């Protein structure tokens, strides 16, 4: 069966969905468009909120592989040199917000799904999940679909821009909002107050120098970064509160609860986790997903970024077209050749998964 048609259709589809704004929690329009596209292609589709699912059952005795990619994007960076929703056309690439993260995986997985539908055969049953709210860990995305996923899939490929390498582990995500407290006073009488900014600075330095002793052979050290700070509204008042954000990328050696408790014990600021469930992930050793990647000589590195994988109740790998270094940056793009490679390698991987 000629694959070129599926590649051409995927490139065309990606241009169309890039033009539809779909920031996290604002995916209604793109979800409706993709539902219509899949239904027009002859698939039975179920929409759960702004998540889209479809099944291909070839043999009840076969396990089911889920193809999962997210349809939402981050907000466009201010430094775009073109309209992120109406980008210029280029001969070798598709430009625009979400083209690389995660539109390339979305359209490549759709093309792969349709390829096996038309082939009417595969060594596994297939389940397609196009998820929402991934970029902001929303409860309406895969977080709220654990039972649905567990009932429909035995294992999964999570589509993210990995250059079609099969990531077999990824760090988790723990975001903490911190508040340092002090006592307000006139700036001319600073000694009468207690500047919350200074407390925050001391705590930030404590966090910055904090050492996590356990190092994972797969995922390395826990990474911690302070990524935002805010205090004060006028020049002549000592601020009584100062807030800051902490981004932590855990390995599997610690639970998020353990990390949170360790950090709270060493700072004066009050810490509040946004979500404790975004755990690290690793494909079980010897799993068919790993064996298939190795048989096809696909590299199996680990990943520094997070994805829907951390919310899945089934074993998975992370693999998709594009380059993670382009994600969340201005002038985002994906190469047409990467879309082609993505579809071809997905088809090859699935065709060989039982071998």
Region roles according to the model:
Residues 2-97, 119:
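Acidic/His- and Gly-rich active-site-bordering loop/insert found
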Residues 90-92, 112-127, 207-217, 329, ...:
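Phosphate-handling active-site elements
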Residues 34, 106-116, 142-145, 200-203, ...:
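Buried hydrophobic packing segments
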Residues 75, 92-108, 186, 319:
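Glycine/serine-rich anion-binding loops at beta->alpha junctions
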Residues 103-175:
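Acidic/histidine-rich catalytic neighborhood of metal-dependent amide-processing enzymes
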Residues 65-67, 129, 155-157, 317-319:
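Hydrophobic/aromatic beta-strand patches that form the interior of the parallel beta-sheet core
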Residues 17, 21, 38, 160, ...:
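Residue-level signal for inorganic ion chemistry
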Residues 5, 161, 168, 175-355:
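Metal-dependent amide/peptide-bond hydrolase catalytic core
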């Amino acid at each position: 069966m000629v694959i070129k048609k599926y590649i051409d259709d995927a490139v065309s589809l990606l241009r169309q969905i890039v033009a539809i704004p779909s920031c996290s929690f604002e995916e209604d329009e793109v979800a409706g468009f993709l539902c219509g596209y899949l239904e027009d292609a002859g698939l039975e589709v179920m929409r759960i909120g702004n998540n889209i699912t479809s099944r291909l059952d070839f043999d009840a005795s076969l396990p089911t592989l889920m193809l999962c990619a997210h349809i939402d994007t981050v907000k466009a960076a201010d430094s775009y040199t073109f309209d992120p929703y109406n980008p210029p056309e280029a001969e070798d690439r598709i430009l625009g917000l979400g083209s690389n993260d995660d539109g390339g995986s979305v359209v490549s997985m759709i093309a792969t799904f349709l390829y096996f539908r038309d082939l009417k055969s595969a060594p596994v049953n297939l389940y397609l999940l196009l998820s929402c709210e991934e970029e902001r860990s929303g409860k309406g995305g895969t977080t709220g679909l654990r039972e649905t996923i567990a009932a429909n899939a035995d294992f999964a490929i999570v589509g993210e821009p990995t250059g079609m390498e099969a990531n077999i582990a990824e760090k988790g995500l723990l975001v903490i909002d911190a508040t340092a407290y002090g006592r307000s006073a006139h700036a001319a009488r600073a000694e009468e107050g207690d500047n919350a900014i200074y407390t925050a600075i001391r705590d930030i330095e404590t966090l910055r120098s904090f050492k996590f002793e356990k190092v994972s052979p797969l995922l390395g050290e826990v990474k911690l970064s302070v990524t935002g700070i805010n205090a004060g509204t006028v020049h002549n008042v000592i601020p009584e509160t100062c807030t800051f954000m902490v981004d932590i990328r855990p390995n599997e050696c610690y639970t998020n609860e353990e990390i949170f408790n360790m950090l709270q014990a060493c700072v004066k600021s009050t810490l509040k986790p946004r979500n404790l469930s975004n755990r690290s992930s690793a494909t079980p050793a010897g799993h068919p997903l790993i064996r298939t990647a190795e048989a096809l000589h696909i590299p199996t590195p680990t990943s520094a970024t997070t994805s829907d994988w951390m919310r899945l109740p089934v074993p998975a790998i992370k693999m998709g077209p594009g380059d993670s270094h382009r994600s969340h940056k201005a002038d985002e793009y994906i190469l047409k050749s990467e879309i082609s490679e993505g579809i071809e390698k997905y088809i090859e991987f699935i065709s060989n998964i039982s071998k």
